[in-house]
Amino acid sequence: MRRTVARIGLVAALALSMSVAAATAPPANADDNVGLVSSARSAAGLMNYAINLDSNVGESEMASAADLIPSVGGALLTSYPQLGTLFAQSESASFAPDLAAALAKAGVSVHSIGPTRVAAVPESERAVGGATPADPAAAPAAESAEDGPVAGEPAADAPDVPTVTIPDPNSRVGSAHSNWGAEAMDARGAAEVAVTRAPVTVGIIDSGIDDTQPDLVGRVDTARSVSCAVNGVPNQAEDARRFSREHGTHVAGVIAANHNDIGIDGIAPEATLVSIKALNESDLLYPEALVCAYEWATTHQVDIVHNSYQMDPWVYWNPTDPEQAAALEAAERAIHRAQSSGLAVIAGSGDRGVDIDHPTTDSDSPTDSTPIPNRSVEGARMVPAQVSGVVSVSSVGMEDWNAEPLRATLM
């Protein structure tokens, strides 16, 4: 295994950086031979779908599934033979049951088929009628590794570019509280311990990273960075992977900001960052983007994956609801494959102050449409925080914001 040690300090850093899904049809009684399949939608409209074949399918079954998608009014978006999963787009209201029937007739066993969201796919992301299926592991690089920055080596001079300061609402200007998280866990003291640190690459699945920010110059490997935000199709073009909001940059700074007497000091300033943009322009992270992000991390030598979000549009995903099961299954397959490849997966469990191990109701979902009040979520789970094997952490704060962070009681 190439992935080894020296990541404990990063786990603490990632933990402190975490703070950052309409109305559905009732569950369908899918035929036992074709698994869980969502009902026909009430009206036609542009929608993306997750399609999971049985886990033991081979290349021929995957090829058959891909070939059948256009015959029922769909367009293939991405195919992951290693997962037994495909994503497709269609305007047909009956796409899911029609595809399930076609696959059953062809002798292809299906685990689940269902939508990845509640709101319709925007016209700007239309793929039906001319989509070119993407190979998620082989997206063309926007630049070669030789042309991009040398990972892990900060530039001698920071570029003269406008920067954005993101204040901590609980900080006191000019005090240690502006970096209170690092102070609270005595990160500086830990960094002074003389140990040999293994080189670590952290994939940040988020809104993208501003790699021109002086605190992050040299930290981001742009040759391995990507956007998965549109239909879960990997795109390394600079304008695609450019950060859409500041959250990903904030997280990157907590983890690996250069120690350069400006801004904050990162917990692991020698770490290499890979920006995996997965939030779309509406600040939503859909299942197809998550699967793309994990497959990218798995195939691009990432050691740790940081997740400061919950997968949209459901805060809690129900594995027995055919409207949610397929997207959940696809996400878990991708996460488990990453874990089996040696990636450590760290995820935030939110900042709602609730017991996510025993959820009862949820009034915040779906996040892309009008939320359903008091939706029953017993037996449902948050993704990725509650996926088996994921290290889940919640946000914390100081009980007394006037106290010194190192000695403060955290809550």
Show the residue positions of the predicted features.
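Autoinhibitory propeptides
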Residues: 32-39, 55, 63-176, 398-400
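Short glycine-/aliphatic-rich beta-strand segments at the starts of folded cytosolic domains
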Residues: 43-55
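Loop/turn elements at helix/coil->beta-strand transitions in domains of secreted/extracellular proteins
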Residues: 108-109, 198-201, 269-274, 299-305, ...
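Substrate-binding/access-modulating region of protease and related hydrolase catalytic domains
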Residues: 278-383
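Extracellular S/T/G-rich loop segment that most often corresponds to the catalytic His/Ser-adjacent loop
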Residues: 369-411
